[in-house]
Amino acid sequence: MSKNNKLNGKDNRQSKIEKLSELKLRHDQLTNELYHLHEYISLVEYDPFYIPNSENYERLLEEKDVTWGSIFQEKKQLHNESSGKKVRRSVRHLRDSGSSTINELDTMSENDINLLKEVDILAKQKLQDLKLQFSNSHIKKKGNTKRAKIVKQVPNHQDKSESPQISERDVKTVVKDLKPNHRGSEIKPEIMESSDVKNEIENCDFNEKQLKLYKDDDIASESDFYFTTSSEDELPNKRRGTIKRRKRINLYVNPPKAVITNPDNIANSHYPTLHEYLDSFKILEDDMTNEEYNTFIKEQQRFAKMIKKGIETGALKYDPVTETVQPSARKVPNMFSHAKVDPIQYMYKEQNLHIHQEHLINQGLFSSKLVQNRKKQRIAGAKKIAQMIEQHFKHIAGAEDRRLKENEKQRKAIARNIIQSVKKRWNLAEKAYRILKKDEEEQLKRIQGKEHLSKMLEKSSKLLGAQLKQHPNEDDIENSTSDDFSSTGDSDNLSSSSDEESDDEINDLSEDQKNNINELKTSSTSAFSSPEISSPSKNPDLGLNSLLTNDFENESNSSDTNEEFIMGDSDTSHSDDENLTDDSEDSNDGEHDTTSDNEKSDLFPADTTNDPLAVQDVPTPSLLRGTLRTYQKQGLNWLASLYNNNTNGILADEMGLGKTIQTISLLSYLACEKHNWGPHLIVVPTSVLLNWEMEFKRFAPGFKVLTYYGNPQQRKEKRKGWNKPDAFHVCIVSYQLIVQDQHSFKRKKWQYMVLDEAHNIKNFRSTRWQALLNFNTQRRILLTGTPLQNNIAELWSLLYFLMPQTVIDGQKVSGFADLDAFQQWFGRPVDKLIETGGTYEQDNETKRTVEKLHQVLRPYLLRRLKADVEKQIPGKYEHIVYCKLSKRQRFLYDDFMSRAQTKATLASGNFMSIVNCLMQLRKVCNHPDLFEVRPIKTSFLFGESVIARYSERANSITRRIHFHDKDTLVDLQNINLQFTNNDLEKTSYHTNTINKLACINEFVEEVQKLRKQNAEEERQKSRHLKINTQNISNFYEEFMQQKLDEQENKINFIGYLNSQRCSRKTVYGMNLIRLLEMPHVSNNCIDDPNYDDLIKPLQTRLLDGRTTIEKFAVLTPGAVTSNIGELTLGMDEFVTPNSKSGIIPYEELVQLDNPFHQVQTKLTIAFPDKSLLQYDCGKLQKLAILLQQLKDGGHRALIFTQMTKVLDILEQFLNYHGYLYMRLDGATKIEDRQILTERFNSDPKITVFILSSRSGGLGINLTGADTVIFYDSDWNPAMDKQCQDRCHRIGQTRDVHIYRFVSEHTIESNILKKANQKRQLDDVIIQKGEFTTDYFSKLSVKDLFGSDVVGDLPVIDTKPLLGSDSEAIKDPKKLEKLLAQAEDEDDVKAANSALREVNVDDEDFDESSTNKTGGNILNGDDIDEDVDEYEGTNHVEEYMLRFIANGFYF
């Protein structure tokens, strides 16, 4: 019994599990359907075999409380209420068999958990079986498929009555995929025959042609992962029992019916079935209606009938090969083309239509692709996760190795730091040892230096004495020193082409030079009666002694020591000014007699031996054209003394004192007196190369000058034949080209080498300095305006360049070859003097050092300032001309300042915005046309419209039709208004008779009386009644009464007309007029002169009135018409030509000149009057008066302006007044610039030269003008200073007046007023020739625009435009860029071009040195501060020093 009970219990448990699994399956299908309807609304893509496993699915079941766990828990809870057990639902459904788990809860027993697991497994197994059965029933049959063969035999002892069982371990059946393999290869299963299993399979419902047996490896190789989808083709890899016939499950879905609340939404079906509805469509095209479709069908039927008829008649025949209809050979009307019909390439819409089944197939294929892609993505994601996990474990496994490597790396780093520290310590010890050794060596050098300095001072004294001595025989000195000087320290490395020549050739050359000098002397004597020199100075004892002594006293006594010895930055202009005046100019000032011997004795006393420092006077060379000033003559004497004493020197006169002419006079002196014609080499900056050539042609035309420039090919042509004797006397070359062609210049021997702007070769380490030092030259002269720089090494480089070795009394002594000693003697005391500015009390050592420096420099340096010779230079006077604004300028100025945008800009304090406002106001001040151009007014031209001609013709026809309407509509004769016709038709007798016979008046009166009586009676009856339309009798009576009233009015009017006609009277009568008529005599000729003015032709009238039209035709109409000729002259093209009337056709009238052209142009276009150009601007009004005064006084003026557009206005102004002028702006080429300046200086008829301040200042010398007019001031004051220097130069013989135009009550006057409060105008604009931002950085908006303009603005306007932290204040170039943004594009280009020209020489001298200036001595400050870290280790340091000193370290 116990066994039976157990068996029954097991059966009951198995049956319960079976029922629960079926319930579980139905539950999953229903919940799946519920979820699909909830998510996708419809069941089109519903898959009953797919159980979703997502958070949304679980959330939905929990919200609806329909989870399987909750149902089971509720049932269990009801069953266990008595026992108090509580079950908590916690079941989760997963899709995969391995992932379907039930959370174990503490409140649930193990039996319940096992039961749920078994139910879940069995339910999923049933679902897989159902899915397999459903998929096999839908496989299409294939005719060529073979029967599936069994892989493994079934045991014979199995009962055949039972259903055969196929183990999933042995066989896996796979449904053949509808889609072929991508590679085109089919899977070939491995087949094993088994008859028993074959019979069992035949008993099943499955079609054997629909199955294939594959090996396990084939399926396993396809995918290592399995993902449950609704469209997978693989069979489940589950173990199943015996294959048996299973029932088909039919699912009936009853979706809930929609609740319709609006009867309009109820669908009324016109077709009972879908098939009938689809048949109702004739064609599946929306564009074609049913009527069009029927028409198309009829056309096709008719076309088919025609083809059939053609075949029957034999006109056409059917070709079965090409399946086309061809025409027969008989001559019948050609209905078709004989050519082969091309196939239709146009795809009609009907060809692209697909049936519903094809759409479903395509959708299935597309879905399959999506499923496969999703599968691949999941596989790829799983692989990535696996790789990440693998890398993680690898990282964990290698952690120990990495730790060991890190420890090893740290140990190496510690060892490296220790090694570096030890090495650094030894380096410091080595530096300390070297410093100690240096100190010892310097101490020895100081002792030796003092001895060497005393020798140098003694040598300088001897040199100065030898320089000032008067040699009795100069030829002997020249011959004795030429050989000695040629053997300099660098002459060993030189080779001269002149060495190849024989001594005979040299002697011949000297004889030729003597002959040439004699010829030039005779020619110069004929051209000039006698050499002229300027008047002597008041001090007769002038000489080098007085100049140098005064300079020394001023330097020693003045507190500002660096003013004399330490000069500032060099001026930007490289061109030396002309220092001579032509003979023609000197003749205007007065005639000078030839200097006699007495005058020479006054200037230079005969007893020169009493003054040891006196300079021997030399005669003015006859080759020099012009007259030297006194200080220039003294410079020539000093240069000649240098030559006579075999000494080189530095001519360091201030810029503008004529270093160029002094150099030319020296070369002329050598040619005339010493018969030394060179060749001489002059090295100048590129910018003044042509200027030097012009100076030689002007003042020394007797020299043959070779200007060395051009491309390499041109320079090679210039070098051809230059080794021949007397090929040239002077060669002028730039610094850049002489370095490039230095090998050619080194091979030639030069007499004199002159370096202009020599302060630019101050870097003795540069290749340029080394190249020039090695040239084969006998003597050298340096020309510079700033010889002494703040760096003593730069001064030494110049002195060493002059005197590498010196010869005194036939002995060679070293010059300034020791830079360290030179710096040791003079560098530190002078640097200390420069740093303090001379404010500290000088000690005796410093004074002695300065005196020694003076003593060393005195023989080699000559410097004069303009302050010393200012009495010999014409004066410069500056005038401020205040100009009132014109009415138009004042209106534009005030309008701009009153704008809200301008006030907002000023209140913002933005620098660029304020500068833009300043630029606009400056334009208004210069000329209002720069701010707002006066417009050219024109009339609005109305063109002829399309309907104009037709409307004009219609109006003409209408006027002609209604021309006589006034005669027909109103008869004026009847109302007696045409009384003049009475005299022409009737006499007075007729009119009187008609008036008497007018008897109708009585009849009319009687009729009126009767009507009046009847009318009064009727009116009294119906006075208070209206027309009654209700009663027909009353209505008729009232209507007739109205009719009688109208008739009465008509009779009254006729009576009125009759009375008017009968009352006509004549004034004179026809008989009187006939008596007074006189016979008419025709005469076609009229001799009255008054009639001649009336019959003048149109052209004559216009010619006579041309003057009147020119003066008074000033009003321009607002609009004019384009066909004015047709309207005024009758030039209408619609006038039909008539030979009798003589009307000219329109085509001929068009060819005629328009006689009204002048009037039309004058009245249509109004140009501004030319005089308004002057009267619109206050500055031009002042300029007109000033130019007239200057022209009357014989002066010539230069007008400068910053803006290029102002030059255009000035051109119009000068043309209007008829002045001869020339123009030079930034667009003028450099080669044209020299031509313009020479023409202006040579032609006194040219009164004005207008220039742009941005036109560049190199090579421009306008000494022909004595007046400078600044129309406006430039942003950059250095530009204005440069403009002044173009006129106020040494070559100027007259005083220079500078006029600066300033507009009153504007920003210009405010800036000038503020500047005058701080300093004088010259100091504000010019600060040593550099651009200054002082007046910009210190001016505020209130200072610029005035207190009345910015009175209501914030406090920010009282602050400076640029703050103290602004970069523009620190860097002037940045300020220039900011100001350039507010200027016009042409002005900015001109300014940049001018700056490039000024800085072109910087490129020649821009050469970075290999090493920095200064010695390599290491001071104690160079030691690193890390020494403090080793405090307390002095014994180690002492040991290291002893170790190094004993020689063990090296």
UniProtKB/Swiss-Prot annotation:
Any single Gene Ontology cellular-component annotation:
Swr1 complex
Q: Supply the enzyme class, top level.
A: hydrolase
Alphabetically ordered keywords of this record: Activator, ATP-binding, Chromatin regulator, DNA-binding, Helicase, Hydrolase, Nucleotide-binding, Nucleus, Transcription, Transcription regulation
Listed Low complexity bias regions? 480-497, 523-540, 549-560
**What highest taxon heads this organism's lineage?**
Eukaryota
Q: HSA domain spans which residues?
A: 344-417
Q: Which CDD domains match?
A: DEXQc_SRCAP, SF2_C_SNF
Hydrolase recorded as keyword: yes
Give the catalytic activity.
ATP + H2O = ADP + phosphate + H(+)
**Which parts of this chain are annotated as the region Disordered?**
469-618, 1400-1424
Q: Which residues form the Helicase C-terminal domain?
A: 1179-1332
Q: What is its main location?
A: nucleus
Q: Where's the motif DEAH box?
A: 756-759
Q: Which Pfam families match?
A: Helicase_C, HSA, SNF2-rel_dom
Q: How does it assemble?
A: Component of the SWR1 chromatin-remodeling complex.
- This chain belongs to which protein, by name? Helicase SWR1
Origin organism is Candida glabrata (strain ATCC 2001 / BCRC 20586 / JCM 3761 / NBRC 0622 / NRRL Y-65 / CBS 138)
Question: Taxonomically, what lineage is the organism?
Answer: Eukaryota, Fungi, Dikarya, Ascomycota, Saccharomycotina
